[in-house]
């Protein structure tokens, strides 16, 4: 992948860009194998890869510059702004949207937030596109609601220019810190969820719910989890840290008793909407802390699926999984190092199968799916 920003030295986010892509996959696989070298792995599967450019469905843009000439991109530590509108990780559909949004910022008088001076209102633009419908979700991250009336008044022009905008909201983030969003979300459109679809499974994205940024590889990840789980012929499962329900909804058959747990109420609303669309009758999605739910629950499912944040599932949940002893644990991880530490705390389980998913080309990061079977 050629990137003018990388060549110019203005953006080095893709730290492995100069490394040939086959070598990237080899290095990631070797890293994963080294982390699990102390455990026997019955089956190592080949890494799954997708497109090397234009694969992202989401842009997180710092807004800087002036209201007349805004920049969308990132800030270096010294405060230097870099416009990332031409980043080759974004699909071709993003560039014209960025152009319109720059005009809109000026038209609506949304002064970019100046970090050094602690002045201005518009901090970030967050853009997500559905590969299923082409619809787009747009979030304005503001320091306060001072410019909210101006934003609302100018929106009809923006919606006329970009009819693909289905979900628009404003997020209020008042803190002078590099935090992407605050707790308060203000819907600006009647529609509040963007529909996506992977492998004929409808999924919904709300403003404050997490969703994978590489749809092509994410669809492969979910499909692989589905195939592994259905081969086990189970009839009950937990999906912990379930997000919008992607894993559980892929794996569940109509008769499967599925419990999905996620701390985010927004994500749970999405999961419930998907389950309703699919007509699944034996599904229960709840907005709870996954560890607290598991350790307080009396029943034992046949399979527990975990998809934790980068920190992993931790000692408390590992200890409880050892105690409750489900037949299978399916572990999906965005941080193989924390996953390896967790697996060390699951001595009663053997590693049946491992597969790497290259969700983040040109970086050292990747996702991994591991099937653990009770001894």
Swiss-Prot record:
Keywords: 4Fe-4S, Iron, Iron-sulfur, Metal-binding, Methyltransferase, rRNA processing, S-adenosyl-L-methionine, Transferase. It holds the Pfam family tRNA_U5-meth_tr. It catalyses: uridine(747) in 23S rRNA + S-adenosyl-L-methionine = 5-methyluridine(747) in 23S rRNA + S-adenosyl-L-homocysteine + H(+). InterPro entries: 23SrRNA_MeTrfase_RlmC, MeTrfase_TrmA_AS, MeTrfase_TrmA_CS, SAM-dependent_MTases_sf, U5_MeTrfase_fam. CDD domains: AdoMet_MTases. One of its GO terms (molecular function) is iron ion binding. Its EC number is 2.1.1.189. Belongs to the class I-like SAM-binding methyltransferase superfamily. RNA M5U methyltransferase family. RlmC subfamily. PANTHER family: RNA M5U METHYLTRANSFERASE (PTHR11061), TRNA (URACIL(54)-C(5))-METHYLTRANSFERASE (PTHR11061:SF30). Catalyzes the formation of 5-methyl-uridine at position 747 (m5U747) in 23S rRNA. This is 23S rRNA (uracil(747)-C(5))-methyltransferase RlmC. It comes from Serratia proteamaculans (strain 568). The gene is rlmC.
